[in-house]
Amino acid sequence: MSDYKSTLNLPETGFPMRGDLAKREPGMLARWTDDDLYGIIRAAKKGKKTFILHDGPPYANGSIHIGHSVNKILKDIIVKSKGLSGYDSPYVPGWDCHGLPIELKVEQEYGKPGEKFTAAEFRAKCREYAATQVDGQRKDFIRLGVLGDWSHPYLTMDFKTEANIIRALGKIIGNGHLHKGAKPVHWCVDCRSALAEAEVEYYDKTSPSIDVAFQAVDQDALKAKFAVSNVNGPISLVIWTTTPWTLPANRAISIAPDFDYALVQIDGQAVILAKDLVESVMQRIGVTDYTILGTVKGAELELLRFTHPFMGFDVPAILGDHVTLDAGTGAVHTAPGHGPDDYVIGQKYGLETANPVGPDGTYLPGTYPTLDGVNVFKANDIVVALLQEKGALLHVEKMQHSYPCCWRHKTPIIFRATPQWFVSMDQKGLRAQSLKEIKGVQWIPDWGQARIESMVANRPDWCISRQRTWGVPMSLFVHKDTEELHPRTLELMEEVAKRVEVNGIQAWWDLDAKEILGDEADQYVKVPDTLDVWFDSGSTHSSVVDVRPEFAGHAADMYLEGSDQHRGWFMSSLMISTAMKGKAPYRQVLTHGFTVDGQGRKMSKSIGNTVSPQDVMNKLGADILRLWVASTDYTGEMAVSDEILKRAADSYRRIRNTARFLLANLNGFDPAKDMVKPEEMVVLDRWAVGCAKAAQEDILKAYEAYDFHEVVQRLMRFCSVEMGSFYLDIIKDRQYTAKADSVARRSCQTALYHIAEALVRWMAPILSFTADEVWGYLPGEREKYVFTGEWYEGLFGLADSEAMNDAFWDELLKVRGEVNKVIEQARADKKVGGSLEAAVTLYAEPELAAKLTALGDELRFVLLTSGATVADYNDAPADAQQSEVLKGLKVALSKAEGEKCPRCWHYTRDVGKVAEHAEICGRCVSNVAGDGEKRKFA
């Protein structure tokens, strides 16, 4: 028997079946680096319209976690897809390098500044530490396949950037947005510094909850207000608080103007409370026998005075909108130095912003004899005992409540009035302008807009000063006596910025004021404060984007970070840009959710449910991680676990197998010589290219809308359904058995070539390593890298006016599905082995019958059977299977007649009819020794 294997066009490619990504990717990365792939892309895109995604700088501390990976991969997908869409999209990664966490790390190793090291040496250690952290994170980000200018990232500690941060502050001062004030700020007594809102976390804490009576100074005036004369004992206004330690700073009692307040007679005294809370307060203080003597509106009590229980002065009743009936007594203890609401209302009434607490959290000398030098959290019991002794304590109990804590130390923080510098939200209309700017930005998802609007509408002035060592100095000089800024502040700041540009922030601390102030130096002092690190990162639109040459003066198109950044980087950037330039720093803001485990739980080392990106890359490869990120809807929480990553690996295999099939069947195809013109191609091949065209339209639309999970779903549908379960199955016969250089085979290869050219580009932003690998195996002249090109433009489809248009093939797909069901049943019943052992008769109503008949003998190739006949629907025998999908179709199956051809495996009656090729069928004889078969349709 002759061996006809050598006459077949068997698929062949060096493209491996197994991805082996964990092993193969590092070598590809090395090639990208050696070739300077990022530089090649920049050169290729030079002069195109720009799309700038500005990197929000991660903090230079610790290893990257899965959340970092999600963030960088999403950015990379966008940058690469924009490149393929014809944009020049430079990506400059950055790092946030100043601030408390780095100081704490350096402190742990070397001690506090001023102990073993000078502050200057301490700063040098911080700079060194940040640089090593940047290097570690950079390696991991590169390993993810993220392309960017990794050799020249921006660091907020670059001398030039530090100088530009100072310049940004100068511009804000010049525009009139800075003011100084004693104001309550979140204060950590362990850090001994003010904290930004983003540095505050909430934990449960147990505190004493107390009801305290403030006796009225003028009892008769109160009786008159309530129109009563018979009151037994003194009258008091009762406040409720869970922070007894703040009582020394009390300067008023806030009540609501529109609430009804009741004068309640209890044993030996009368108390004033909100009428709606009388019952709950009486229950709490254990009084069952009480009488309401009268009621008045809160507004009636404004400015009546009450004696502080132990401080020896009296305080006014004032009206505030922050008073609620949720808990307490309807009268709020007000200490302007210890709370933002208290501060705001204190300003309105001209109250003192008293601050009896030092930076270490202990009372300052002269506060009160038994409290001086005591830590405020230890003082609660002393204050309670004091109130008891003075007869002012009506009730005390322990209460668990949510309390603000330092994100670093996890210890409770306090509100403490300190002299700080603020960017004012209202003195020059910053709030109003920011709210206006928000409306001109596209927020993705769109709920981001309402979220940041409410934050901007309600946020207090931004405290931008910090009492730290490792940070950008505010670079201000204030008058010794008046504490006013130097009249030449902007000039002086530019002078400092020039020095910082050369020598870094240490230049400020080394600066002798005489050098730039001359004789005035004796009258001015250098402000020792540093800037909040959120000012560093929030000003990068100016300190980085405006000055990097690759951005050519264009503003950022997009900021993309986790959803916690509405209150963080998106907010600080908006504030600074609007204060500097009167406009938002971005056109689009995209936020992604946090990563959770497979059960939806937050990632936590203590639960042990964290997923390390390094582990995933070492086991499965970066492309699997990238595919997981792309296939997850980032607008909500992003679940990741071993099981979920395994599913991503399964999807990856399907895509890889499709790519491998295309490459293997392009064996021997040279597009320059072998390409078949569309009008000469087999109709099914044109249909397949049309499928790719339709898929490309959907995929490009999804990339444009940043719907990457839609990209993956459409890609999977194309690979699995349109190609895998239909087209690629059908063409195997023609690919393998037709004459190597026949139109029948070259038409098919032409289709596969067009499909592969499109597919490799669809994959490139997401499966970057695999796309690069596929690119290397594609036939034909091409650039070295897929990333330098654009979406494939060589796709075409069938015209609707053609008889065998898309609708025709859609119906054929359904027919084939119905035939497959019948074949599967026959296989289960052991009537046939494979589908080529079967012949089918399709009993069809006239319209469908005409379509099926149009394919002639090629119908069997579409159905993958050895025989296919079309007959009248009404002639169907009783055992023909009625289609559930197509009402006008019944299918009958019989065993195919004739012998099996060993070359094409079809059963046919003409095997052995040609003497020289006695073992094979007539079709194969023609393909081996004759002119070759002709195919028109399939």
Swiss-Prot record:
Disulfide bonds: none annotated. L-isoleucyl-5'-AMP binds at residue 561. It holds the Pfam family tRNA-synt_1. One of its GO terms (cellular component) is cytosol. Zn(2+) binds at residues 901, 904, 921, 924. Its EC number is 6.1.1.5. The keyword Cytoplasm applies. A motif ('HIGH' region) lies at residues 58-68. GO terms for molecular function: aminoacyl-tRNA deacylase activity; ATP binding; isoleucine-tRNA ligase activity; tRNA binding; zinc ion binding. It comes from the Bacteria. ATP binds at residue 605. It catalyses: tRNA(Ile) + L-isoleucine + ATP = L-isoleucyl-tRNA(Ile) + AMP + diphosphate. A motif ('KMSKS' region) lies at residues 602-606. The modification N6-acetyllysine is found at residue 183. Its cofactor is Zn(2+). Binds 1 zinc ion per subunit. It is found in: Cytoplasm. CDD domains: Anticodon_Ia_Ile_BEm, IleRS_core. Keywords: Acetylation, Aminoacyl-tRNA synthetase, ATP-binding, Cytoplasm, Ligase, Metal-binding, Nucleotide-binding, Protein biosynthesis, Zinc. One of its GO terms (biological process) is isoleucyl-tRNA aminoacylation. It is an enzyme of class 6 (ligase). PANTHER family: ISOLEUCINE--TRNA LIGASE, MITOCHONDRIAL, SOLEUCYL-TRNA SYNTHETASE. Belongs to the class-I aminoacyl-tRNA synthetase family. IleS type 1 subfamily. Catalyzes the attachment of isoleucine to tRNA(Ile). As IleRS can inadvertently accommodate and process structurally similar amino acids such as valine, to avoid such errors it has two additional distinct tRNA(Ile)-dependent editing activities. One activity is designated as 'pretransfer' editing and involves the hydrolysis of activated Val-AMP. The other activity is designated 'posttransfer' editing and involves deacylation of mischarged Val-tRNA(Ile). IleRS has two distinct active sites: one for aminoacylation and one for editing. The misactivated valine is translocated from the active site to the editing site, which sterically excludes the correctly activated isoleucine. The single editing site contains two valyl binding pockets, one specific for each substrate (Val-AMP or Val-tRNA(Ile)). This is Isoleucine--tRNA ligase. It comes from Escherichia coli (strain ATCC 8739 / DSM 1576 / NBRC 3972 / NCIMB 8545 / WDCM 00012 / Crooks). The lineage of its organism: Bacteria, Pseudomonadati, Pseudomonadota, Gammaproteobacteria, Enterobacterales.
